[in-house]
Amino acid sequence: DTDRSRGLGDVYKRQIIGMPVVMNSTLLNCAVVCQKGKILGIVPKTYLPNYKEFYEQRWFTSALNHPDTNIRLCGQNVPVSANLLFDTPDTCFGIEICEDMWAPIPPSSSLVLQGAEIIFNMSADNEGIGKHAYVRSLISQQSARCLAGYVFSSSGFGESTTDVVFAGNGLIYENGSLLAESERFSFKEQLVISEIDVERIRGERLTNTTFAANIGNCPGRPAIHINTEFVNTRDLTLTRPIEPHPFVPQGNELDQRCEEIFAIQIAGLAKRLVHTNCKTVVVGISGGLDSTLALLVCVKTFDKLELPRKNIIGITMPGFGTTDRTYNNALHLMASLGVTIKEISIKEACIRHFKDIDHDMTVHDVTYENSQARERTQILMDVANRLGGLVIGTGDLSELALGWATYNGDHMSMYGVNASIPKTLVKYLVNWIALNGVDNESRITLLDIVDTPISPELIPADEQGNIKQKTEDLVGPYELHDFFLYQFLRFGFRPGKIFYLASIAFRDTYNEEVIKKWLTTFCRRFFQQQFKRSCLPDGPKVGSVSLSPRGDWRMPSDASAAMWLKECEEL
């Protein structure tokens, strides 16, 4: 459209053009990089296919047959090399041509190890049955392996169809993920536009020590760096979608991913039970999402190990804030799943405890709340000891990130099956299991649990018996915190970058002031609550983000959040 064309005008000051180039009485298949009428460099093709319908060696010679050199082209002295890297103020890019990508070690593998963050591939790639999917797989794999952006452009309508057909594929990938693609077999010219997040690429490379280890073993000739002029992109509007729920599988992947996540949880718990020769587990069932998912994992694990479900001891422990809705859902769920049901009220024990510690129980402060959580954990631990069982933890990744757990209360267990699953994903998983993995009676209860407000229920209900203490009113929406968590842990983004992305992802849901408020809360609590994560129980890693102090996240408990909070203030 007109606005986009106006905004992109400066970007077109750099062009990559395919053309044949004569050098030393031989013909090279080349990509020529230009900017503002100046030829910056010529990149010849390295691997020339000479099989089946291809016979490029009839015309061209390989870059391998020529040393890096300079030639005169259009009155300019221009470097010629397959190892050219083009430096911009923001990034660095390299080029390979068509068949180069199909080689066992593509030229791009060497280019990225020498600094390229984006690879451009100019191609004349003809169509065949199933070939398009194969090409997409190649590009995705090379982009993922190189931790790079990959821009692929192939010839289309207008090419000769004497023996083959060209569909005009345009594909943009980033670290293995497709960002944008053209319409195949279009009779019109197309412009495929997206943005590649080079900060994200750099974060991936810093984290991946295998990438760094390969830099010293880089194949091929040393790269030649070419400086390019600054291009103004400030007026560009972001076109790539920013997924507001990055932990949640989308579209056709939902069923497969949910099944895989559930299977990982089951496999983790099964191994622990077999290793300990334990045939009994104890789970506190509140009628909320987390304990529900933990119970479902236990049920499926026992089925897999051919152990009786009666060996799953589900304990509901009503307290001062328990509502009829969650209480009844807990009982109905345990009954429908066929586990052993125990009900132990914590009220009398807590009242006695308040007297022992001289606490006024009309004061609903942190002591009032945490005493209940620790009483429940004590019950679970002691019942497990009596029966020779394991206490299964229910806390999720979002709660661990925010420290929304009572230290040595629900924070503690003998194996935490939900430890790397964020709250937004817990909700989707329970809903998926309700629709795919249980009978109708359990399904009705599960769907009501999904619709129940998230709450620890440590404060008495309101006059109508409804939940008064709603977690998201206190610490903020979990969908925001999970978004912050993903961008912070997965890519190491600063608050400013996270705020920018969140403002786009949630522009129809939250205004910028709300996002800033809860981002500040996230940064403050994440640093403050590390001491709880430093002593977490074992639990299986499920996705790409984990807070295990033994694995993915080793952070001092007294790390300062000052820099992050200062940046939040300046947003």
In which residue ranges do the predicted regions lie?
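Single conserved hydrophobic/aromatic residue that forms the stacking wall/gate
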Residues: 1-12
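Generic structural signal for hydrophobic
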Residues: 3, 111, 142-143, 273, ...
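CN hydrolase (nitrilase-like) catalytic-core segments centered on the catalytic cysteine
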Residues: 10-17, 96-192
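Active-site-adjacent helix-turn-beta-strand microarchitecture at beta-sheet edges
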Residues: 14, 24-27, 33, 40-41, ...
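Fold-independent oxyanion-binding glycine-rich loops
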Residues: 18-21, 31, 36, 43-45, ...
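Active-site catalytic loop in hydrolytic enzyme cores
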Residues: 24-114, 130-138, 166, 187-188, ...
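Conserved acidic residues
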Residues: 36, 117-118, 279, 389
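ATP/NTP-dependent adenylation/nucleotidyl-transfer catalytic domains that generate, transfer
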Residues: 89, 146-148, 157-160, 174, ...
